[in-house]
């Protein structure tokens, strides 16, 4: 499987990452990526930037080191209502919105509460993908949530860092189940390194191996071509990005 998009990466702006967007783009180029989503942590995460930072991504060039740059965020799910920590006025400035649970923002609660939060954030229409949902601290009704994601064209991330065991220990078992059920349901999958240092960009081997284990069709893995990824954004109702015209 050839993956040409990394949909989950962080820069210095996240507060606990160690590279600039230029360094990330250079690493992406060296590793053969065509598109890179820059997705710093949203404001409620300790050390994260103000929402102006995300709005101001409109000044970023569409290409850095010949890699297309998608302007994104890793938003925090705040509550069972599925609210996220950016104002709706920010949506117009963002190409790619990940929604994730993080312990400092949403304290682990019950399976019912986690499920409600995920269903509601999907139904909000404000997010494109659920991030690192295999975290064992946040059990949820996998089948219900994935069915809802399918109905609303929200992708499910396979997070490589979760599978390494270096973060969110114990995620591998739940990630395996999520991919297994996701295949049955027919969701779209995406692959994210969750890089917090430029050398981790495009480190997706474990995510790819898990998708291959369940023989997920490449037309359901939106990071396997620029066309699949960009047309998924169109499916989500995002406008065409003119600078990427030749990549659709």
Curated annotation (Swiss-Prot):
Binding site for Zn(2+) 2: 16, 41, 196
Signal peptide: none
Binding sites annotated in the UniProt record for Zn(2+) 3: 74, 102, 132
Keyword Iron: no
Claim: Protein transport is one of the keywords in the record: no
Keywords: Hydrolase, Metal-binding, Zinc
Cellular component per GO, a single term: cytosol
Positions contributing to Zn(2+) 1 binding: 8, 10, 74, 194
Cofactor(s) named in the record: Zn(2+)
Class in the EC hierarchy, top level: hydrolase
Family recorded in the similarity comment: Belongs to the PHP family.
HAMAP family according to UniProt: YcdX_phosphat
Protein's name in the database: Probable phosphatase VF_A0065
Species: Aliivibrio fischeri (strain ATCC 700601 / ES114)
């Amino acid at each position: 499987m050839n993956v040409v998009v990394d949909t989950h990466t962080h820069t210095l702006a996240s507060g606990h990452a160690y590279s600039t967007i230029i360094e990330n783009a250079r690493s992406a180029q060296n590793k053969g990526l065509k598109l890179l989503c820059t997705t710093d942590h949203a404001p409620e995460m300790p050390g994260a930037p103000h929402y102006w930072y995300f709005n101001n991504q409109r000044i970023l060039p569409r290409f850095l080191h010949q890699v297309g740059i998608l302007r994104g965020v890793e938003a925090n799910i705040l509550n069972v209502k599925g609210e996220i920590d950016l104002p709706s006025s920010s949506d117009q400035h963002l190409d790619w919105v990940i929604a994730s649970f993080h312990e400092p923002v949403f304290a682990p609660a019950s399976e019912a509460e986690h499920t409600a939060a995920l269903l509601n954030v999907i139904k909000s229409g404000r997010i494109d993908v659920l991030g690192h949902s295999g975290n064992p601290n946040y059990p949820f009704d996998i089948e219900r949530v994935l069915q809802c994601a399918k109905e609303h064209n929200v992708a499910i991330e396979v997070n490589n860092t979760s599978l390494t065991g270096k973060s969110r220990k114990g995620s591998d078992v739940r990630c395996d189940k999520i991919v297994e059920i996701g295949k049955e349901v027919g969701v779209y999958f995406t692959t994210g390194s969750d890089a917090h240092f430029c050398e981790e960009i495009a480190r997706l081997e474990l995510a790819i191996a898990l998708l291959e284990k369940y023989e997920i069709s490449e037309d359901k893995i939106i990071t396997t071509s620029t066309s699949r990824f960009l047309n998924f954004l169109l499916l989500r109702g995002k406008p065409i990005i003119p600078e990427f015209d030749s990549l659709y």
